[in-house]
């Protein structure tokens, strides 16, 4: 009979040190980099910009209102955006 398998300790994830308030540098980075992303969602901004979810939602809402990005699909919780098509 095979020996009893030991329980693994599991992986420990470090606590994210994401920004919780907007400052000038974060706003500038969002305005410069996000319109170039092909796929834009709250989780993408949290991952790439190192901001928390509420800031990501505010940033996406602001960019959409200004017409910099456009909505592709809206799930019950997650909205998906893409860069705005170049006006021809």
Swiss-Prot record:
Q: List GO terms (cellular component aspect).
A: cytoplasmic stress granule; cytosol; cytosolic small ribosomal subunit
Q: Note whether Ribonucleoprotein occurs among the keywords.
A: yes
Q: What is its main location?
A: cytoplasm
Record's keyword terms, sorted = Cytoplasm, Ribonucleoprotein, Ribosomal protein
Name the chain's protein: Small ribosomal subunit protein eS25B
Show the Pfam families listed in the entry: Ribosomal_S25
The record's similarity note reads: Belongs to the eukaryotic ribosomal protein eS25 family.
Q: Which PANTHER family match?
A: 40S RIBOSOMAL PROTEIN S25
Q: What else is known?
A: There are 2 genes for eS25 in S.pombe.
């Amino acid at each position: 009979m095979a020996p009893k398998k030991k329980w693994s300790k599991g992986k420990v994830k470090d606590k994210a040190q994401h920004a919780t308030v907007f400052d000038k540098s974060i706003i500038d980075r969002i305005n410069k980099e996000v319109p170039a992303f092909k796929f834009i969602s709250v989780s993408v901004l949290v991952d790439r910009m190192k901001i928390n979810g509420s800031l990501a939602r505010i940033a996406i809402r602001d960019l959409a209102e200004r017409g910099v990005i456009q909505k592709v699909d809206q799930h019950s919780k997650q909205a998906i955006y893409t860069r705005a098509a170049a006006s021809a």
